[in-house]
Amino acid sequence: IPEHNWTRTHAGLFDVSHMGPSFFALPKGHGLEGDEAHKKVASLIERLVPADIQGLKPGQVRYTMITNEGGGVLDDLMIARPAEPGAAGDLYIVVNAGCKHQDWALIEEATKGEANLVRADDRCLLALQGPNAHVAAAAVIDPALAEMNFMTVKRYDAFGRITVTRSGYTGEDGYEILVRAENAADLANALLAHAEVKPIGLGARDSLRLEAGLCLYGHDLDPKTSPIEADLAWTIQKRRREAKDFPGAKRILREYELGAAKKRVGVRPNDRAPAREGVEIMKDGKTIGVVTSGGFSPVLNGPISMGYVEAAHSEPGHVVDLMIRGVPRSATIVPLPFVPHKYHRPKKGA
């Protein structure tokens, strides 16, 4: 809990090197330039995901999912378009640790040698998260980091050569930094020497992402659950909805138009008993859903859960029962996130 609270008020440094960072690029000598090269490489990855990757501007990052033909989710991931000269036709992709070998195989199979997937196995991924992450990053790495917008990517000649996205999975402002393994300890130690930064473990990372209402693959997302059920319709941009050309489009677009039978929601138990994954959600003695993530919220000083319920019961304010050890306990459906996001976005009119 102290680690969680420190990240919400200062800045926490996480080692997330178990994730799956990689680079996906057109073959050398592809002969394409600028937007043309980007559209080509993006069209290849769009065979797997429903997001508009061709529409990424230089330096932009997008959250998306790999979907299957049944409209379920095989993984969620970040895809970035590096802006540097010479990066035309390159994408930077970060997938989840537990799915990385499956994802890489899917990418290679779907793109059949039309582009090269290079795993960043020789690098470490560090996440610096919290309201003062920008202060430490600017002081230790480069003052320009403070000016980066949320969901953008940039490369810096510091600590070797690093790739930085202003992103993360805590609901706070922050960065994810890809650094060569031989430079990682120097970077981590330099950040930890800053008064605002402390090392944070993966237990706090999970409670932070739960407060932020963010999905954990294998729990809140799985091969049977669609992006629409998961309340992630915003990740499917208009061009892809109109083209209807991604895996699972039939089911996903039907649910997009008509609504899904179930929906991911926030659940606040009305007492102190935590409801963890697998707990049934009941209404009038009937099972209407299940908890997929649950735990204690240090910010709210009480238990919180996410889960899926029948759409008819998904509106905030609905009172439900959680079957905890065979005893029904009252809870309320609430909006997500539990704790407001504090991402760094450009000021209006700036």
Locate the predicted segments by residue.
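A generic secondary-structure signal marking the coil-to-beta-strand transition
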Residues: 10-12, 20, 62, 75, ...
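Acidic active-site catalytic centers that drive phospho-/nucleotidyl reactions
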Residues: 15, 76, 176
